Amino acid sequence: MATINDNYLKLKAGYLFPEIARRVNAFAQSNPEAAIIRLGIGDVTEPLPVACRQAMIQAVEDMGQRENFKGYGPEQGYAWLREKIAAHDFQSRGCEVDASEIFISDGSKCDCGNILDIFGNNNRIAVTDPVYPVYVDTNVMAGHTGDANDRGEYDGLVYLPISAENNFTAEIPSEKVDLIYLCFPNNPTGAVASREYLQAWVDYARANGAIILFDAAYEAFITDPAIPHSIFEIPGARDCAIEFRSFSKNAGFTGTRCAFTVVPKGLKGKAADGSEVELWGLWNRRQSTKFNGVSYIVQRGAEAVYSAEGQAQIKELVAFYLENARIIREELTAAGLDVHGGVNAPYVWVKTPAGLTSWDFFDKLLQVCNVVGTPGSGFGAAGEGYFRISAFNSRENVVTAMQRIRSAGLA
C-alpha cells in the first residue's frame, strides 16, 4: 500500500474557514428563514474594475485571432506586467526592485506555502500569535514541526504573541530564528507597522542571517503616509526579505487569481555544505518546474490596474471597503465593544464580551444576529477572546449587520 505524508495527520481538525462554513451551513439548514450576513472570510463582494474587465475582454478576443493568440506564457509572468509592477508599486516608492525579481502567480496564499520548497527542514521558524493559519499549516505539512500541544501550538515553531498590550506588533525574539513571517497590514488584527518597527526586524534578520517572509497582501488599504507599503522601503531589506503581494483585495481578483512575489537577486541562503546560494535562482527553478504561469487573459486584467482608469477604480474600490470598516468600528464601539484595527486595514479585531470565548461569541452572533465573523482563537491561542470582522461586503449588508448587533446588546 502506498504511504502518505504523515505530517498532514498533525494538522488540527479542520482548517479554520471550512469549520466556519460547516457551522454556518448547519445553522442555515435548521433555520432556512434566516438572512445570514457573512463578515467572516476575507472574500470581496464588489465587481471587478471596469478597466480590468475591458482588458480581459480584449485579451479573450486576442486569443481568438491567430496573430495574437498566446499559448504557454513565461513561468515568471509576462514582462509587460512585471515592469509595470516594478515601476508603480516599488520604484515609485524608492524601492530598488527590478522587474526580473518579480514572479507572477495565482495567489499570495499559494506563494506563502510554496516558498517553503526552497528552504531546508532545519530552520527555526517564527510566527506571530494570532497568525494567518496558512503560515503555520504549510510548515506542518512540510514536516517542519512536531505535534501540537493542548493550546494548538506546534513544537518547532517560535510563537510571538501580539496583543493590545504591544499594539498587536510582536516583540523581536531574544533567541535566533531563521525564517520570520510578518504580515502588515496585519491579518487578522488590522494592525500596521511603523518604519522604525520594520527597520528593527530588518536589522535583526541581517544580524542573524534570517529571512523575513513579508506578506503585504493588504498594503493598498494603508492611508497613513507614514506607514511603509513594502518591506523594501526599509534600508537593508534586500539582504533579508521576500515579499508577497496580491491583486485579490485591491482589485477584487479573489475569483480571478493573480498575485506576485518579489525575490531580490543577491538574497542568499546556506546550503548543507556551508556554501551560500542565491534564493532567486532556487525560486525561479521551482516555479519553472512546478508552475506554468498565470493565464494571459488574467495578466492583461492585472496590467489594467496600472492604467490611469484602473488606478482611479481600485482606489474607489479600496475606499469603499475602508468606509465599511469605519462603519463597523464606530458601530461596534457604540455597542460597547473593545475594537481594534479597521483604519489602515479591512479587518476589525474585536474583544469578545466578558465570559465568552471566541467560538462562544461566534455561535451567539450567528444565532442571535444571523451574522458570521471569524473566531480569534482560530488564528492561534493568543487570539482567544477576540473576534475578526471583515469589511468585505456590500454597504447594505454591513449596515444591517451592525444594526442587528447593536440591537442585540451583545456587549
Swiss-Prot record:
<protein>
    <recommendedName>
        <fullName>LL-diaminopimelate aminotransferase</fullName>
        <ecNumber>2.6.1.83</ecNumber>
    </recommendedName>
</protein>
<dbReference type="InterPro" id="IPR015424">
    <property type="entry name" value="PyrdxlP-dep_Trfase"/>
</dbReference>
<dbReference type="InterPro" id="IPR019942">
    <property type="entry name" value="DapL/ALD1"/>
</dbReference>
<dbReference type="InterPro" id="IPR004839">
    <property type="entry name" value="Aminotransferase_I/II_large"/>
</dbReference>
<feature type="binding site">
    <location>
        <position position="42"/>
    </location>
    <ligand>
        <name>substrate</name>
    </ligand>
</feature>
<feature type="binding site">
    <location>
        <position position="132"/>
    </location>
    <ligand>
        <name>pyridoxal 5'-phosphate</name>
    </ligand>
</feature>
<keyword id="KW-0663">Pyridoxal phosphate</keyword>
<comment type="similarity">
    <text>Belongs to the class-I pyridoxal-phosphate-dependent aminotransferase family. LL-diaminopimelate aminotransferase subfamily.</text>
</comment>
<feature type="binding site">
    <location>
        <position position="388"/>
    </location>
    <ligand>
        <name>substrate</name>
    </ligand>
</feature>
<feature type="binding site">
    <location>
        <position position="187"/>
    </location>
    <ligand>
        <name>pyridoxal 5'-phosphate</name>
    </ligand>
</feature>
<feature type="binding site">
    <location>
        <position position="15"/>
    </location>
    <ligand>
        <name>substrate</name>
    </ligand>
</feature>
<feature type="modified residue" description="N6-(pyridoxal phosphate)lysine">
    <location>
        <position position="249"/>
    </location>
</feature>
<feature type="binding site">
    <location>
        <begin position="246"/>
        <end position="248"/>
    </location>
    <ligand>
        <name>pyridoxal 5'-phosphate</name>
    </ligand>
</feature>
<feature type="binding site">
    <location>
        <position position="132"/>
    </location>
    <ligand>
        <name>substrate</name>
    </ligand>
</feature>
<feature type="binding site">
    <location>
        <position position="292"/>
    </location>
    <ligand>
        <name>substrate</name>
    </ligand>
</feature>
<feature type="binding site">
    <location>
        <position position="109"/>
    </location>
    <ligand>
        <name>substrate</name>
    </ligand>
</feature>
<dbReference type="GO" id="GO:0010285">
    <property type="term" value="F:L,L-diaminopimelate aminotransferase activity"/>
</dbReference>
<comment type="function">
    <text>Involved in the synthesis of meso-diaminopimelate (m-DAP or DL-DAP), required for both lysine and peptidoglycan biosynthesis. Catalyzes the direct conversion of tetrahydrodipicolinate to LL-diaminopimelate.</text>
</comment>
<comment type="pathway">
    <text>Amino-acid biosynthesis; L-lysine biosynthesis via DAP pathway; LL-2,6-diaminopimelate from (S)-tetrahydrodipicolinate (aminotransferase route): step 1/1.</text>
</comment>
<dbReference type="Pfam" id="PF00155">
    <property type="entry name" value="Aminotran_1_2"/>
</dbReference>
<feature type="binding site">
    <location>
        <position position="218"/>
    </location>
    <ligand>
        <name>pyridoxal 5'-phosphate</name>
    </ligand>
</feature>
<dbReference type="InterPro" id="IPR015422">
    <property type="entry name" value="PyrdxlP-dep_Trfase_small"/>
</dbReference>
<feature type="binding site">
    <location>
        <position position="72"/>
    </location>
    <ligand>
        <name>pyridoxal 5'-phosphate</name>
    </ligand>
</feature>
<feature type="binding site">
    <location>
        <position position="257"/>
    </location>
    <ligand>
        <name>pyridoxal 5'-phosphate</name>
    </ligand>
</feature>
<dbReference type="GO" id="GO:0030170">
    <property type="term" value="F:pyridoxal phosphate binding"/>
</dbReference>
<dbReference type="GO" id="GO:0033362">
    <property type="term" value="P:lysine biosynthetic process via diaminopimelate, diaminopimelate-aminotransferase pathway"/>
</dbReference>
<keyword id="KW-0808">Transferase</keyword>
<feature type="binding site">
    <location>
        <position position="187"/>
    </location>
    <ligand>
        <name>substrate</name>
    </ligand>
</feature>
<comment type="subunit">
    <text>Homodimer.</text>
</comment>
<dbReference type="InterPro" id="IPR015421">
    <property type="entry name" value="PyrdxlP-dep_Trfase_major"/>
</dbReference>
<keyword id="KW-0032">Aminotransferase</keyword>
<feature type="binding site">
    <location>
        <position position="292"/>
    </location>
    <ligand>
        <name>pyridoxal 5'-phosphate</name>
    </ligand>
</feature>
<feature type="binding site">
    <location>
        <begin position="108"/>
        <end position="109"/>
    </location>
    <ligand>
        <name>pyridoxal 5'-phosphate</name>
    </ligand>
</feature>
